[in-house]
Structure formats: C-alpha cells, structure tokens
Amino acid sequence: VVNFGGHQVPRVIADYSGKSTITQASLFAVGYHYSVPLDKWNITDAACDYLFLGDRAIDFPVPGTLGVIYNHAVWLQHKEQERSYPFIRAEHFVKGVERSPKLNFVYACLKDITDELVQALNGDPTTVLLIDTWNKHGYAEQRRLFVELINRNCQCPVVVGRAYRNLSPGQLQLYAATDMGGLLIDSLGDGVFIAAENCGPDKMVNDTAFNILQATRTRISKTEYISCPSCGRIVRWATTTRPTTSSMACARSRRPSRWRRSPPSPGWRATTA
C-alpha cells in the first residue's frame, strides 16, 4: 500500500497533533530542514515519512517525501491537498465513510478486531491498520492483536502505535524500545508511531523511532562501527594501526623457518575441504 508493507522498510509517523502552530521550522526536529534563501527542503537520513496532525492544519507546502495525516473530519476539508490522508476509526471505517483513493489509516485496538473489520480491510487495497492499546501490559495485548490478524488472514500492513505521557527521555527510550522492538524483531509491524506527551524534545522522539528500527535491523538509517572481537579496533583506528600491524606481519615473515608452522599434509587438507 503506497510505501507500506511488502519489501518496503518500516515507516515512521511523527505526532504533531498537540502543537498549537506548525511552521517550516517545526519540521527541523523530524529531519526536514527548510532553506529560506534557496526556498528548498533538505532531508536528513532520519526524516519521518508521515506527519500526524489530527485536527491541526498547516498553511505551507510540505516536502515531496512527507505525507500528512488528518482526522477524518478535518481531512474532508483538505482532501484536495496533495499527499494528505485520513485517519479513520475502525467503527466508522466499517460503516463506509468517505475514503482517500490512495491511502487510508484505520485506527483499531484489540477489541475492534472482528471478522467484519478484517473483511473490510482486505476489501480495500488502500488501507493501513494503525494499532493501539490502553492495556497496562500493552506489549502482550498488541502481540495478541497480531495473532488475531494472522488467524483471520488480514492482508493489510500494520503500524504499531504507542502513546506515552510524562516520562523522562531515558524512560521513553526504554519503554518504546521494549514495547515496539519486541514486535518488530519478530517481523510484526510495517511502521511505528510514537505519541509522546511531555516526554522530551521532538527530535529525541523521532530519533528513538529510527533507533528502534535500526536496532531490530528492519531499517538502517545510519552507519554503525563494530569493534573487532579480538583486538577491539574499529574502522576509525585503522589508519593508525595498519602500519603497525603491517610491520608486525613483515617481522613474522622474516622469522627463521623453524618458527613457522609446517604446511598441512594432503590428508588433512582433503579431510577439511
């Protein structure tokens, strides 16, 4: 569905529904940098794919790679806007409200998963299911929700959504990584949506979403340097250690023959080949 599911990487949805005003500068935190002199957008590697505005609206053209999600009633007023999509609750979706011909986000919790809803989702190739939970043990409930979708043969992509409030940045990172990472690492989910109220800067929340995808190896957005398990060197040390290791190798090659290991016998080579 558009860029969800299949062989696509999981998508990141940023929550801007709680902001009173949204300007070009507001998108800096989610990876979109607007250049006033050049009148163009510069996009970082950790730029979110969609922006959830809820009942809010923006009065400027968004970058070409960014989709905007409105609550259904507000979307009806902006449906002619390019790359704008509705956010529809499950009970309204089943009743057959007006939909976008390109992409529709359907909000559902475990109690909303019924045969009627799954049939409606499978019958519309433009739908993406955005799941949420109010359960204290939300991770287990959302895993159960995925089991229900699998048992009912639901074919639409699923975005894992979680809401947090009044947490420190460290707590948010730990909770979100546990709640979402455990699902993504089992290939459950085609995107993430973190709604964090009073939990830290928007940039930190956005980076947390991308770091979760990076840690689960479902979407690589930055280069990682892994040290050698033997000596502890990493790539950035290679330029300083290579001359040393090269000279050591040359010294070993100049040792007398009695210090060298004798070549393996043909029988050993045949056994290990």
Predicted regions and their residues:
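Catalytic alpha/beta core domains of metabolic enzymes, predominantly
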Residues: V1-F4, I13, K111-A273
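Active-site beta->alpha loop and helix N-cap motifs at the rims of alpha/beta catalytic domains
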Residues: V2-F4, R11-A140
